[in-house]
Amino acid sequence: MPDFLDIALPLLRLPTAPFHEHRIVAAIDTLIDDWSSTHTPLSIERDTAGNLIIRYEGANSGDWLYLTGHLDHPGFGFVEHLTRQDLLFERLGGLPVQFCRDAHVQIHSTRDLHPPLSGRITAYLEDTLFEGERRPAFRVSVDESTTAVGHDSFAVWDLPETDTKKRKLRATACDDLAGVAVGLTVLANLLKEGARSRVALLLTRAEETGFGGMLDYAASDQLDQEGVFINIECSSCLAGAPLGDGPVIRVGDRRWLFDPQVTAALVKAATDPSLAQLPYQRRLMDGGTCEATVLSRAGVRTAAVALPLANYHNTGRRGVRREAINLDDAEHLVELLTRVARTGATNLLHSGDSGQDEWLQ
């Protein structure tokens, strides 16, 4: 079965943006199809919002453990033609607008109706009126006719190719495609081992524009009230979690503290004396809000982990830059989540009970 890099590199080379995750979804469909056979306990489904739920059912009973991540990254959504060579794009998610002037973008089509077009941002329009609302937008100029660009088109930063160097993985959209790759690698490990557990990977859409996919899932009948959830994110290292010091076991975010029992179980799995000790960082990570808060507020047991991230949302010191994670952090996070996934949700909660007792002694 493939390892983390085998899965991450192809995904991270694909464009994505809120509401424009189709290339990532197609790649995951192909991957799961390659792994599946008539005897493989693996299935994939979509909910009404377009979220993916990949299930590994290695046991016939027991509560489900859900790993979650999101399929999008901040980008630009096409609005209208201004002239034959000038286009208006709306802002989709958090973008480093202070560096946008003259920055280059690649324009894609949701249905792949045209090859990527190169464009340049010529203006940031902070208060643009369209569809009855005032929203931030960008004017993008291209060197050729824009007749191929339509309402299914979107744009992403035009940055150097994804690569690895000195144990760092650099890509336009580590957040959260690296987290998605971690979850997929955990499923690959379970398949390889034939683990007797029930684990699902929930991959949501439009997280960067206000948790659209997760809010829809949390409000739907598909929300598993008996399940245990662990959110996988990439979170800025500026919150006090350096790259290379291990993945973060996240006790909370800006708005919420997560389930202490599940958090304790994660710590116990990392420090299990019968296995190799895994480096980890236990942090609040209050620089922003993540999908674990949505799930917690919906009433389900939720914890969170994160990969420390450099150049969060492509914000470098002097311009738009690729994001970066540490490969050791990613591989240790895969191992940590594989350990808890092997045990399943019920055993995870029992482990968390004893882990909390140890903290109080």
State what each model feature region is.
Residues 1-361:
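N-terminal hydrophobic/helix-forming segments and targeting peptides
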